[in-house]
Structure formats: C-alpha cells, structure tokens
Amino acid sequence: CFDERFFAHQEEIDLCWRLQNDGKKIYYTGKSKVYHVGGGTLNKENPQKTYLNFRNNLSMMLKNLPAWKAFFILLFRLNLDGYASIYLAYKNGWRHIWAVFMAHVMFYCHLPKSIALRQKHQIDPYYQTKWLMFKHFLGSKK
C-alpha cells in the first residue's frame, strides 16, 4: 500500500520500488490511457509542492536504495538540492529555497522512522539513469 506520509507526490514510485525490492515484478500496458490533471493538487509555483517533492524523494531513496549507496547518494543530493533551490527560486520565487531547506530539515527529523521502514533487501542495480538530472537541468531532456 501507499506510504501515507507521501501525500500526493511520488507515492506511486515508492510503491513500485518497494514491490521490486520485495521480489515482485512491475508490469504496464501501453494500451492504457491515464489522464493526469497536472497541478490538480498543487501548482508548480506553490512552494508546498516543492517541499513535498524534495522531502518525499529523500525519504523514498533512503527507504529503497541499497545501504551502501544511500549515504553517498543522499550526501550528493544535499549538494544538488542547494543548486536546485536556487534554480527554483529564480523560476518560481524565493520561497522555494525555504521549501527545499525545510524538506531537508523534516527528512532528517524523521530519519529514524525512514530507516525503520527500510526493507531487508534492496535490489541493486535495477535501473540506469546516466546523468538524467544533469540533462534535465541543462535543457536537453524534459
């Protein structure tokens, strides 16, 4: 089931990741149609959306990454998120810097609970991104 702490952001990714870590397979059909109301809960200019996206993603990575990767990736994310907050402030307003900062504060405050939610087995490797985030922020991938 969905992690109730992930209100409206990244809950489906977390669920699929946990299912994979539990040995389940994820299937899809290209014939299905999904209608998504972008910004239906919070629009992209809303700092609360930024907060939820950053906080939920940090928690999701801690819960699902192999232990040996989690520390290094989260440390790297701390640095990247600083740059991302400046970018978001430029694009959507200064309150987004505070939203990213508070996402990190709340993530670290709830660290024991996130660690307790880790499963016994994390699949490694199961995906490959090859600098996807850099391509996105440099404008070549949207």
Language model feature labels by segment:
Residues 1-33:
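A short, conserved alpha-helix in the catalytic core of glycosyltransferases
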Residues 5, 106, 133-136:
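Intrinsic disorder/low-structure terminal segments
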Residues 22-115, 124, 128-131:
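Active-site-adjacent helix/loop segment of glycosyltransferases
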Residues 120-142:
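Anionic, Ser/Thr-rich low-complexity intrinsically disordered regions
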